[in-house]
Amino acid sequence: MDAADDTPAITDRELLQAGFRYGMALSHSVQEAEDLVQEAWLNLTRRYGAVASKALLFTTVRNLFIDQCRRRKIVHFESLDQPEPPAVPVPDAEEPGLQGDVAALLGVLRPAEREAIFFHYYEGRTAEEISLLTGQPRGTVLSLLHRAIIRLREAALSSPAAPRCNQWLLFFVSSL
């Protein structure tokens, strides 16, 4: 019996949840994430009959997101020389507490930075693994992570809702 037989099979529900979390990291919108996962799932089941792995689902979701960005032309090029201070939107009243604060802070990141943060801190992947998944050089991934952490710190400290960002949130972004 080899090591591959020892790992439990991932269920469709777990795949969908992981795909949705990844879609949220890319799009930062519940509706777009749901649409991305649904379209990816449909494409994969039509083509292969089933979704074989998380990697295949993530790749399909990412490609669909890139296609949507190209169609909408929402890819923003930002100068890295003198970045503007990020403006953190005030969280909705429907999202009180830490969840709303984290969502607002992640909203200041570019999609590429959110993707790197998602893979590194939520999925527990190394920079090398992220570079293989996204097709970017390892140095670019490290730069994205570094810039994202700096932007999160600045946003958390300069937010008008900084007192709401309680000490847990400040601990999170200062310890990254």
Question: Where in the sequence are the language-model features?
Answer:
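A short pre-motif secondary-structure segment
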Residues: 116-120
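C-terminal flanking helix
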Residues: 20, 41, 110, 114, ...
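Arg/Lys-rich amphipathic alpha helix in sigma70-family domain 2
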Residues: 52, 59-80, 95, 154
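Structural recognition of an alpha-helix C-terminal capping motif at a helix-to-coil junction
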Residues: 35-42, 51-63, 143
